[in-house]
Amino acid sequence: MDAPLYPFKPIYSLKALSLTLGESAELLESLAMRSSNLYRYVPQAKKDGPPRDTYDAYQPLKSIQRKIVDRLLARVRFPAYLHGGIKDPLNRRSIYSNAKVHGNAKFVLLQDIKDFFPSIKVQHVQQIFERLFGFSEEVSKLLALLTTRDGVVPQGASSSGYLANLVFWDVEPMLVTRLEAQGLNYSRFADDITISSMTPLDSATLTKLVSAVTRMLAEKGCYQKRSKLHVRRRGQTLKVKVIDEFVPLTVTGLTIFNQVPGIPKAERKAIRAAVKQLEDQAEHGASWIQLEPLARRVMGRIGRLIACAHPDGERLKQRLHALKARSQVALLGRYAAAQPESAFSVE
């Protein structure tokens, strides 16, 4: 059974935890007792709906959470079905690896966990450290307090993504094993769950699959977001209310009804338009200093094309590089023209 595994010696005392993290036990206990007051609210805008509630820890809690990640959480051997926010040089995890699991699928079942991070309670985190890692109750309770805010896992903290991957550590592997025995593929990227089949599925089977996932979520006090539950056959499109258009079905933003995940046509068109907009702004006199913030964001979007091996990726990348070179040369020319002639004379 493919399941999370912590293959190292358990930590039984606060002294041992102190040595592992390189911080005094007194500091760890002090921060744990007041950790809920050591965050700043950093709302993240979404394409639709209200902003996403995210939090960033203040120092020194932030650096201690980073140590908890690097020295404990990141050392877990994560099962292949988990793809979100995991550092694994031997089996790289990303939106691409997640979508690739379902390439060429005939049927896809998409499910979303409602209010995922706030649903992960401090007791769930303590159970992860106590039962999966094998740590003592004292150590597990302290680590749970250091990685939660107001009794729940705060989205945005460096440790939160790892805890989100591990919260179903004792129930998800059994579900995946049963699905694989039926010839189905399963993956989870944070709160996005995808199940796919290479053969048609009848309505009774689909109902059982939804119920099985619902039961797994309920084990940890989580619920499905009913508005994000979708069942699609190969070739079907999905109507997006925001743009009032039908678009191909995607898994973590990538089309999956081919062997290799791809970027939807509408997104490719938008990326090309963004590059053209930058070129037009440069033609009208915008400097690279003015263009750079937008250019960085556009380059990130181009990176998605390159990662999917789409030919537009390299072409658009070269256009941005050429734009940068032209803009910087033009900036130097304007600077030179603005200087008095004596500034460039040599005696």
Where are these regions (language model features)?
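Right-hand nucleic-acid polymerase module
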Residues: 1-138, 142-157, 166-169, 173, ...
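Catalytic palm active-site di-aspartate
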Residues: 110-114, 156, 160, 182-200
